[in-house]
Amino acid sequence: MFNDLLSELTKNILEHGGKKLIVPNEFCECVSKQGNCKLNSWLWDVPGFRRWRVTRLDAGDRLQVLNSVAYPNEQNDMPIMGIDLLWFEKKQKLVAILDFQPLVQDKEYLDRYFDGLKSLKKSFNEFNSDMKSNIYDPTKYFSPWALFCKGGNFEAENILPKIFSSFLKCYWKNLDLSKANENHIKSQEVSILHIDYDKYSAEKDPAHGLFSGFFGKEWSEKYMKEFLFPLSLENINS
């Protein structure tokens, strides 16, 4: 599960001039001590982006994960792209979130960047669920039009591939849109908001518990802070 989507994402990145960056060996591939789970990580240098990372976790029929986050460069105030897909084979359960994660929640910013996502949410009822969370504040770094699905094999096999392709196309359109318009947020503020995003995510992301169960707490903390959310180590006032 998700290998075809990973290939599509990789193809998209390459078509937009992406080049692979070196990932430290300890993060590039990690296998659990029990040998029942493998994690692979990729980091991309993509024109227009400060950082683009991808994670693929394969725990067999227990769990499959595809996660990707793309941070535009500081001169671009467009939303951060977030993809988080989980498949539980034994339970035949899909949990999927795809979102353009807004740096701010004001109307002018949302009107500029979210027409495409609004349209997708209307077009795919299966991904029109309300995202309720005891972990995240849905008004902080999530859009009102986040594509969220709790489904089964039908959604995983038939709906997810379609919405995944459309989602990526919409995000690339946002990149073109951002180049044609003056930023709504100044670059210095964009940098600060990216740091805040990483700090918030490093604290809230439930993946830490998941990784700890497979790879141990020490490795997981290092992976969270050094690979997934490295700006969480920055001083936001510096």
Curated annotation (Swiss-Prot):
Pfam families: Fe_bilin_red
InterPro entries: DiHydbiliverdin_OxRdtase (IPR023658), Ferredoxin-dep_bilin_Rdtase (IPR009249)
Keywords for this protein: Oxidoreductase
BP term (GO), one: phytochromobilin biosynthetic process
Domain of life: Bacteria
Gene Ontology molecular function, alphabetical: 15,16-dihydrobiliverdin:ferredoxin oxidoreductase activity; cobalt ion binding
Function, as annotated: Catalyzes the two-electron reduction of biliverdin IX-alpha at the C15 methine bridge.
Family assignment from sequence similarity: Belongs to the HY2 family.
Protein name, per record: 15,16-dihydrobiliverdin:ferredoxin oxidoreductase
Species: Prochlorococcus marinus (strain NATL1A)
Lineage: Bacteria, Bacillati, Cyanobacteriota, Cyanophyceae, Synechococcales
